[in-house]
């Protein structure tokens, strides 16, 4: 089950 999540910082 997926829900809208806040944007995450770019992975290193």
From Swiss-Prot:
Record GO biological process:
regulation of blood pressure
The tissues where this chain's protein is expressed are given as:
Expressed by the venom gland.
Keywords (alphabetical) are: Hypotensive agent, Metalloenzyme inhibitor, Metalloprotease inhibitor, Protease inhibitor, Pyrrolidone carboxylic acid, Secreted, Toxin
Give the molecular function GO annotations.
Answer: peptidase inhibitor activity; toxin activity
Family, per entry:
Belongs to the bradykinin-potentiating peptide family.
Summarizing the function annotation, the protein's role is:
This peptide both inhibits the activity of the angiotensin-converting enzyme (ACE) and enhances the action of bradykinin by inhibiting the peptidases that inactivate it. It acts as an indirect hypotensive agent.
In Swiss-Prot or TrEMBL terms, this protein is called Bradykinin-potentiating peptide 12d
Organism field: Bothrops cotiara
Provide the taxonomic classification.
Eukaryota, Metazoa, Chordata, Craniata, Vertebrata
